[in-house]
Each structure stands twice: as C-alpha cells, then as structure tokens.
From Swiss-Prot:
It holds the Pfam family Resolvase. It comes from Bacillus subtilis (strain 168). Residues 83-102 bind DNA. The keyword NADP does not apply. Residues 1-56 form the Resolvase/invertase-type recombinase catalytic domain. Keywords: DNA-binding. Disulfide bonds: none annotated. The lineage of its organism: Bacteria, Bacillati, Bacillota, Bacilli, Bacillales. GO terms for molecular function: DNA binding; DNA strand exchange activity. SUPFAM superfamilies: Homeodomain-like (SSF46689), Resolvase-like (SSF53041). This is Resolvase homolog YefC.
Amino acid sequence: MTPSLYNPLAIASKPFPAIYSEKILIFTIFSAFAEFERDMIVERTQEGKMLAKQNPDFREGRPKKFTKQQINHALTLLENHSYKQVEDMTGISVSTLVRAKKKKAAEAING
C-alpha cells in the first residue's frame, strides 16, 4: 500500500527507496510550476479584460455573426419561403432563424 501523496506525515513516517522520494520531489516541483502558470494566465486575462473594458465600444463575449438588419431581413423572407430556402438565400442557419423568430415573438408579447 502506497501512502497518500497529500499526507506528508504518511510519507515521512515510512521508509521508501530514493526513487520514490525523487518522484515525489519532481511531481511537487512540476505541480508548483503548473499552478504558477495557471495563476499567471488568469492574471493576464483579467488585466486584458480590464484594459478592454475601458473602451466604450467593448462588448464582452462572442461577437454577433449577423446584424439585426440581416436577421430582420431573413425573418421577412420567412413569410414567403421555407426555413431551408431562407437559409440557402441568406446563409443564416435554421436554428438561428428559429431562435430569432422566438425572440421576436417574445418581444412582441412583452411590448
């Protein structure tokens, strides 16, 4: 039975070959570097977001692929064409059209 890596007393209280101790040392060093690198990535990401938020045109998240005008045009095409036909004409996927149509209907209900 090997002792827990997270319990240093269990490791220190039992004699182990030098190879095992070296493995623990290397594992600990690599773990520390990995944690440090992760913290640095988080820190750089947060700094970049703070700088980007200073721009008044900043919008967090994924940019929209289609403008509202393009979506509205596609929705008007749906009055006379099928979803597949509108998809072929505009390049807007059926799922996006369905989602936009539901959103437009909800906005009409809510005012």
